[in-house]
Amino acid sequence: MLRHPKLSPYARLRKYFEGLVQVAEKKEFRGGCLLGNFAAELSEQSEMIRARVSKGFSTWSAMIANVIAEAQAEGQISKDLPASTLAAFVLNGWEGALVRARVDKSKAPLEQFVKVTFAKTLAP
């Protein structure tokens, strides 16, 4: 979805996260994010796993940052902060919302994340 050629960068980002909400709901909020799970459970026990999880988050954040930068270039997202900073913040927020959704067995935290992220954090 992040590379969909017919959607604007902003629309691609929004649809991407809305799709992740649907996946979490379909899985009944079980399992969560593999990277997040490894980070929480194993990063202190294995330096190799910690390094790979860190690289995974960096790669994911860079993918999001690339789309944010496109949206900034098109005036769809403010240029007040670097795309990399916004992407890291958005990804960290998503991971927190996903943990809360798992605990509450509810999509409300994920929907709140999407609403606030796209109304405020990634606003023009």
Task: Give the location of each predicted region.
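Short amphipathic alpha-helical interaction patches enriched in hydrophobic/aromatic residues
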Residues: 1-3, 24, 43-46, 97-101
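Amphipathic C-terminal alpha-helical segment
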Residues: 23-26, 70, 90-107, 120-124
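Hydrophobic alpha-helical connector segments
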Residues: 1-31, 83-90
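Generic detection of well-ordered alpha-helical segments
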Residues: 7, 11, 18, 47, ...
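Residue-level recognition of alpha-helical structural elements
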Residues: 9, 31, 49, 79, ...
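Hydrophobic alpha-helical bundle segments that form small-molecule/ligand-binding pockets
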Residues: 5, 45-49, 57-83, 123-124
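Amphipathic alpha-helical segments used for helix-helix packing
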Residues: 12, 27-48
